[in-house]
A protein has these predicted regions:
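Peripheral (often C-terminal) accessory segments that flank ATP-dependent C-N-forming ligase machineries
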Residues: 65-156
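Active-site "cap" helix and flanking loop/linker of ATP-utilizing ligase/carboxylase catalytic domains
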Residues: 4-25, 31, 41-93
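Phosphate-binding glycine-rich loops and adjacent basic patches that engage nucleotide phosphates
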Residues: 19-30, 100-110
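Short acidic-glycine loop/turn motifs at beta-strand connectors
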Residues: 30-33, 133-135
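Active-site nucleotide/adenylate-binding loops and adjacent lid/helix of ATP-dependent enzymes
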Residues: 1-13, 137, 143-147
């Protein structure tokens, strides 16, 4: 029911805005199952970055196909995935220092993406990590452990 309502709202926005390419529509859901549009982005969006590894065609390729008037690619999921943002730690600001990468990269099917921002500050999006696994439950558990392990702090 909620998914159908979200799709209807998103389709209405697409038609209203006459978008060519991707249109990411981010919703918030309250405890009464009311949907609220939180963000509309006419571009690839952070919430779809997992498609880089998890889908046959990523959101980036889909966007290019759309604006170049090419047929859309297959969106089939290759693997269950969990993605989370790497955010600057609270109480840290300055040149970014990443902790826990070595340990994270020792794990199979873990993909770290750093956005190249030299300076961090609390809650700044500095990158993301995507975890693939055979089940969503296993990917979720691995992501929870990684979120505690990988940190973005600063030299100062």
């Amino acid at each position: 029911k909620i998914e159908i309502k979200a799709k209807k709202i998103a389709h209405s926005l697409i038609e209203l805005l006459d978008v060519e390419g991707l249109l990411a529509v981010e919703f918030l859901l309250d405890k009464n199952d009311n949907l609220f549009v939180n963000e509309v982005a006419p571009r690839p969006h952070n919430s779809g970055h997992h498609t880089i590894e998890a889908n046959l065609t990523s959101q980036f390729e889909q966007h290019l196909r759309a604006i170049l008037n090419l047929p859309p690619g297959n969106t089939k999921i290759k693997s269950p995935a969990v993605m989370f943002n790497l955010l600057g730690e609270e109480n840290f600001a300055g040149p970014a220092v990443y902790e826990g990468f070595k340990e994270a990269l020792e794990l199979d099917r873990v993909y770290i993406h750093i956005y190249g921002k030299k300076e961090t500050f609390p809650y700044r999006k500095m990158g993301h990590i995507t975890v693939l696994s055979d089940t969503i439950e296993d990917a979720t558990q691995k992501a929870i452990k990684l979120k505690k392990l990988v940190r973005v702090k600063s030299k100062q």
